[in-house]
């Protein structure tokens, strides 16, 4: 978001004159599931989700530092991403207050887990806490078997 008080795009420090041909977000495996990491701003762009689908990622971790009462938008965006990609999404949002120069920001928390079916499985409200969930490889496989989004894209040469 390119606001005078919060230019999130500048945090990525990519020269605007340089074309970026490839992305390579972090991916690692644990317990038979591939995990990807997608920072808050990146979650808005299809290219990251396409990459995770190509790599057969089963859970995307989305660390954020969101403010401006944007929680409803984040919930809808990440529920849709989880469902259309048949994977878990775990959003960890900063909570608390911070001052940057003359500006003060209130980070509202509201971390949550979304299932491959697009449902909120567990969440924290506007409070500090520990959020636990089980990432179930069988649930990922069941969602992929039911909707077949990835399979249909691959069969059409689109992925």
Model region roles, listed by residue range:
Residues 1-55, 68-76, 80, 145-148:
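Active-site catalytic loop in hydrolytic enzyme cores
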Residues 43-131:
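CN hydrolase (nitrilase-like) catalytic-core segments centered on the catalytic cysteine
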Residues 2, 96, 128, 137-139:
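Residue-level detector of flexible, active-site-proximal loop/helix-junction positions
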Residues 14, 57, 115, 155-157:
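Amphipathic alpha-helical interaction segments
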Residues 5-10, 120-121, 128-131, 142:
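A broad, structure-centric signal for solvent-exposed, well-ordered loop/edge residues
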Residues 28-31, 116, 135:
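Active-site beta-strand termini and strand-to-loop segments that position acidic
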């Amino acid at each position: 978001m390119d606001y005078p008080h919060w230019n999130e795009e500048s945090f990525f420090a990519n020269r605007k004159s340089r074309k970026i041909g490839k992305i390579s977000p972090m991916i690692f495996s644990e317990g038979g599931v591939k995990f990807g990491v997608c920072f808050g701003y990146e979650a808005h762009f299809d290219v990251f989700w396409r990459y995770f689908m190509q790599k057969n990622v089963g859970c995307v971790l989305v660390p954020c530092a969101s403010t401006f009462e944007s929680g409803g938008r984040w919930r809808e965006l990440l529920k849709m991403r989880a469902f259309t990609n048949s994977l878990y999404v775990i959003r960890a949002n900063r909570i608390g207050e911070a001052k940057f120069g003359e500006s003060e920001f209130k980070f509202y928390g509201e971390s949550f887990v979304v299932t491959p079916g697009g449902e909120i499985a567990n969440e924290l409200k506007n409070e500090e806490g520990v959020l636990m969930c089980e990432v179930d490889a069988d649930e990922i496989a069941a969602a992929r078997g039911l909707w077949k989004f990835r399979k249909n894209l691959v069969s059409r040469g689109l992925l």
